[in-house]
Amino acid sequence: MKFNLSKEDYLFLIRNSEKELSDTICDTSEQINGNILISVVDAGNLLGLISDAVFLYGMDDEYAPTEIGKRLYHIYDEILYQKCQQEEKEKNNDSE
């Protein structure tokens, strides 16, 4: 699957996550609009690793999200939205 992230979100995600997350990304390319297109084999694994990053780096001692956690949640939501859109499009193409 391919996901389109702003360059800022992509760099933030890479800086605030474990090495395993960058290992799940097969390919990246910068788009004309400055966004980054990332390709992954397993979108579920990518989302799981982002969740791990929220827990490891984005929560305070009382498990409330910090600014890092909120930004990681935003990126998680964006990728999940794009994943659902792609799956819906594939489902509609298969039914035609």
Where are each of the predicted segments found?
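General N-terminal targeting signals
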Residues: 20-22, 30, 55, 67, ...
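N-terminal acidic leader/helix
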Residues: 2-41
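Long amphipathic alpha-helical segments
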Residues: 10, 76-83, 87
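Short acidic DE-rich linear segments
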Residues: 86-96
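Acidic, low-complexity, intrinsically disordered interaction modules
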Residues: 32-80
